[in-house]
Amino acid sequence: MTVTLSAYGGDPRETGRRAALRAPGRGCHLVTDAPTVKAAPDKGVATYFCQHTSASLTINENCDPDVRVDLEGALNKIVPESWHHEGFFEHVDEGPDDMAAHVKTTLIGSSIRVPVTRGRPCMGTWQGLYLNEHR
């Protein structure tokens, strides 16, 4: 899955920068240090947008790798794939993980805005940008 990230600075005449980021597979992936995230403007606001209907972006704790596992597990409890087999969803043609992934994306969101200084996202010490691939 490839995510398109757009980053815009403080100048409204700027067209912005776009870059692609490849998700390694299902799960919550810390992408703060990915070259595409670093394609942000020198200052202003970076808007990261995921052009995919079963993936989301969020900011969360970046120190303990268990956070990624726990986030994935919690999302699977909140929106279980078993709903596919229980008749909860009408949209079922693309497999048991498809509609659950769409719901997770809707709950978390497909874009995020982050202030930028010196070309780096301004986040707290323990914050990182996550790409969540839900299927």
Predicted segments, located by residue:
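Active-site histidine-anchored catalytic micro-motif
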Residues: 1-135
